[in-house]
A protein has these predicted regions:
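PAPS-dependent sulfotransferase catalytic core
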Residues: 1-82, 86-88
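Short, function-defining helix-loop hinge/capping sites that tune catalysis or transport
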Residues: 23-24, 42, 93-95, 128
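PAPS-dependent sulfotransferase catalytic domain
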Residues: 29, 94-141
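A basic- and aromatic-enriched beta-loop-alpha substructure that forms the phosphate/nucleotide-
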Residues: 83-91, 115-118
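Short "domain-exit" segments at the C-terminal end of structured domains
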Residues: 142-146
Length: 146
């Protein structure tokens, strides 16, 4: 069982994609240091998060089926430190978080550390708006002055 699990939950638009890219590209080097980043494909943690949270996502939920269980199994079988990272985990419900902790071996002695990356609100709001516009094509909003 992993001794320590670093569970990076985002939040969105805080450099998470860059961090995940660095972790994914450096899996062999991390493994040499005893650190597991369990991913055979770049979006493995995204699919696992969709599965854990049972989120619909444009048909990807069928690809996601069983992904969290597989990721958690690999973490439990690893002896050392494991890292899991995806920003949609920041919106997990209390029940989803409890299920994640249990499946990662928290009740059996694994140390699970939740890592939260944040951004100052002045930059976060426009970044979220821009991301929503990119995904949906258009977005209108009325802002009231105070």
């Amino acid at each position: 069982m992993s001794e320590r699990v670093l569970l990076h939950v985002g939040t969105p638009k805080t450099g998470t994609s860059y961090l995940q890219d660095v972790l994914f590209r450096n899996r062999p080097e991390l493994a040499e240091a005893g650190v597991l980043y369990p991913a055979d494909r770049f979006d493995a943690h995204f699919l696992a998060a969709l599965d854990l949270m049972r989120l619909p996502w444009g048909g990807l939920e069928t690809q996601a089926e069983g992904a969290w269980g597989e990721l958690a199994r690999r973490v439990r079988e690893h002896h050392g430190t494991a890292i899991i990272s995806h920003e949609i985990l920041a919106s997990a419900s209390r029940q989803q978080a409890a299920r994640a902790l249990e499946s990662l071996g928290h009740g059996d002695g694994a140390e699970v550390h939740v890592v939260l990356s944040v951004r100052d609100l002045v930059r976060q709001v426009p970044a979220e708006w821009q991301e929503n516009v990119k995904r949906s094509g258009e977005h209108t909003s009325e802002l009231q002055s105070h």
